Amino acid sequence: IRLSLVGSEMCIRDRYMYDNGYEWLVMMDDDGIPDKNEIKNLIQSYDKVVSAVGKEVILNALVADKDDKDYTAFLWARGSRRTTKITELQKEQFFNDIHPFNGTLVKRSVIEKIGMIKKEMFIWGDEKEYMARAIHNGIGLYTVPAAIHYHPKEKGRKGNIIPFISKYQILVKPEKMSHYYYRNEGFVYNTYPEKKKHMIVFCTAQIVYNITHFRFVELAKFIKYFREGMHNKY
């Protein structure tokens, strides 16, 4: 196995690796730390997962909080009841849920099929768009718990859509950079049929949250940038 580390934005790194003939790309942010056996475990698991699910896949390491290694750095998707405890997750060989671009193994054949990362979406959305594109093209997304990647804890926070009622929550990003998130979500929800069916629910949750928390400036920002993303205005 020949390994190279290439800096710069992920879209530039991946283009360099692809153009130089590499068979495998491992995507990760510069604030993540791979376990010493991460890449080995991902590559060794690839054919096993493909054989089990019967289609091409993108594999991901299990992303642990680097300051509390007993738990994942990120929560799972909305509605998921999957645990965040590492030892429980490691009881499975692989599962259909990932935290992408944190130890993400992509085979060259997948890139040939779905293309490169949309560079304009860098930060809080490029990874989500690429995974949505993969799903749209019939590619499976799986975490391999034997492969571990360490990352700082999620910067967003969960907020109650209606104050004091914790049953319904959304991910709340820091206001200083939230426009990137809104714009990229607009593009993803409006582009892929698998996501479009959930767009009304997502927008309603954002609107209600900002109204009930008196965040009217943030609400205006959400409407502006979500619409820009819907129309691919970058």
List each language-model region with its residue ranges:
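Acidic donor-binding/catalytic loop of UDP-sugar-dependent glycosyltransferases
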Residues: G32-S45
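A short, conserved alpha-helix in the catalytic core of glycosyltransferases
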Residues: T104, V110-G115, E120-A147
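Short beta-strand-to-loop acidic/aromatic patch adjacent to the donor-nucleotide binding site
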Residues: Y22-I33
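A recurrent flexible, glycine/aromatic-enriched loop bordering the glycosyltransferase active site
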Residues: T87-V106
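Non-catalytic, C-terminal membrane-associated alpha-helical segments of glycosyltransferases
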Residues: Y189-Y234
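Short beta-strand-to-loop element that shapes/binds the nucleotide-sugar donor at the catalytic cleft/hinge
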Residues: L59-Y71
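Short, small-residue-biased leader/transition segments that mark boundaries at the very start
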Residues: I1-I12
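Active-site nucleotide-sugar/metal-binding loop of Leloir-type enzymes
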Residues: I12-W24
